[in-house]
Amino acid sequence: MTIHQHPSSYRDPSGYVFEYDDLLYRQINKTYEAEFNLLGNSGLLFKLIEKKWLVSHEEITPGLDEIYQHLETDPLRYKIIKPEIISPLSYPYEWSFDALRDAGLLHLDIMKLALEHGMILKDATPYNVQFRSGHPIFIDTLSFQKYDEKVPWIAYRQFCENFLYPLLLERYRKLYSHQVFAAFPEGIPVDVTARLLPLRSRFNFGCWLHVFLPAAVAKSKNPRPSEVSETRETSGTSGTSGESAASFSRQKMNNLINHLYSVISSLKPNDKSEAAWNTYYNETILSQEYLENKRKIFAKFISNLDTRQVLDLGANDGYFSRLLCEKGISVIAIDNDAPSINRLFRRSAAESLNILPLIIDITAPSAAIGFANEERAGFLNRIHCDLIIALALIHHLVIGKNIPLEKLALFFSQYAKLLLIEFVPKNDPKVEKMLASREDIFVAYTRENFEKIFSFYFELVEKESIAGTTRIMYLYKKR
């Protein structure tokens, strides 16, 4: 079997991740030997794993594991470890506000604990975080270094660009943080953030201290050290200032971390505008009776299915995702409505649900990005599911997005062996409302044609009409 270095693991000289036999391993180089030993001997590694803040790992002993039989001799190698696998992977350009905030707070929690053990984080990127049962978990064991009390936090600017600034822009500008990462995948610079934030944000001390002050200092060709160091004395912030390294004490580092924690934990998403689907089931023509009838059919369809992971398309608030979760099934719940996904994330976090809520438009899912388009795989290349559920969605795709039924049937068949789908006909009030403002060019959108086209790719397992409506639910198995 071939060993492949992971395409996103090439920047850090401390080591790299590689794949062998569908498993992930991490090589630790000799340049990181002292830090890795300190991480373990100080007790920090044990504490991080105990708190479920860092993935656990197994050290691979030479001669006792077949992996060493396939590795070439490497004079740089110190150790090989096999980290715990977190799947599926997600990235910040797919996260909701509270997901990004929790990932940022995890960094600061880890920093505070690391300082107690004589270490710090040498970088602060959201790509080092994944989510498990609604909670963030750090995945890079090599991000820790020995703390030097005379040196400011080297990752301060990176932390602000990747966590604080996107959150501030969503709070003050209604510019969703996942959209910020789509434009700035490595974090948004301070000068851009300062230009985008409204005037009123200047009266917020956290914004002034972490955004407008460093932006002004960066803009100035010859800033005076006192312009930064005197103002930051109270809060202990650092990063791009002219403050002397010798003056940056452990107390100032703690002040910085605590102040960032206070600022970020106080931020809330801008909820002034209601999400399009906030009241989908309660205040629309779709009644609670419809929802209950649909739930009964759904429960019957999934009762005997052997499935471990489900992709819920157009998940909204995750009502049906939660029903799956109750059966011990892992769910990837996606929707392009950010407030809905954020509410689902909060619930998943509060109840530790095995649901990964992501902001994704299935008609334009996250593409592969990074160097050679290989560092971060596209969404559709990261998911592996047994069942796709697409409830009250097909009319939005066919009529709203002009996607032919043939393309949808083929698409669904490529990504799962089972499909649970709800057909919403033209005489449904929702579809009538959609067609009221546009020409009906969708001659092929009929129940008969839907069944005919989907039968090319799937075998029908079950089919049932939803009482009180003209909608029909289908359970299909891939041919």
Model-derived regions, located:
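Conserved SAM-binding loop of SAM-dependent methyltransferases across substrates and taxa
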Residues: 317-329
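Conserved SAM-binding motif I beta-strand of class I
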Residues: 330-335
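Conserved class I S-adenosyl-L-methionine
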Residues: 306-316
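Conserved beta-strand signature within the Rossmann-like core of class I S-adenosyl-L-methionine
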Residues: 411-426
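Catalytic activation segment of kinase domains across protein kinase-like and atypical kinase folds
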Residues: 120, 125-171
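A short, conserved alpha-helix within the catalytic core of class I
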Residues: 396-412
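A conserved beta-strand element that flanks and buttresses the S-adenosyl-L-methionine
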Residues: 389
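S-adenosyl-L-methionine
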Residues: 345-382
